């Protein structure tokens, strides 16, 4: 069984301490999954990965894609309101090129579960279900206290062992709009797991939704509309490193970083099966990457 994880970001220090959060996240992903795809989208100067590379425990399973600003503008049809880190397009680039039997769409600030726990979810599933895993919060105060007053990226695994047994399930339901039976948990986009055939059938994330908000709920509704099951998982834990910002769509809509949001009714109320083209994820374009 091969498991791939897709992580996206932009080198803009969104939420603060982005490099530090990314280091914990990517190290844990490298450890848990067979393949980790990092897509750096629209970074103003250089990929975030270059800033943290020296603190990563690389072992040859990290694929690094860079979509520079000029390419990002072209791929969003020069829409001035497109999300600065355009999640749906960046995720689809990774999902379309992932080689795993199971694919996880996740975020840059997540400390990932242990391998055996992910395998347990998969082995107890029916191969026709999309899962969303509920996060638990971990703060910098907790991290620094555990490490003796500082950050210790090389002992991320010891930190994970500690917070595994010193945290509680976070059961927080969510409905974005009347009739939303698809979000099922708060922040459902932190960790979405499905067999590759489901991602292929629904053609990844809906590529019209190039603004912040609702794309994660949308992809879960699409899975149901295509005849698949949807389930929330509250244990095993995965951990969101709290950055203290309002968030709202992974791109700072609440803070005004992005000025326009996806329409909630287009994304949730009226979504049926996918409208993505067969070339979703820009499969008709060869995008270079490096393996680290």
Predicted segments with their positions:
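Conserved catalytic core of nucleotide-sugar-dependent glycosyltransferases
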Residues: 95, 113-207
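Active-site acidic Asp-centered loop
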Residues: 41, 106-109, 206
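N-proximal low-complexity "stem/linker" segments adjacent to membrane-targeting elements
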Residues: 1-27
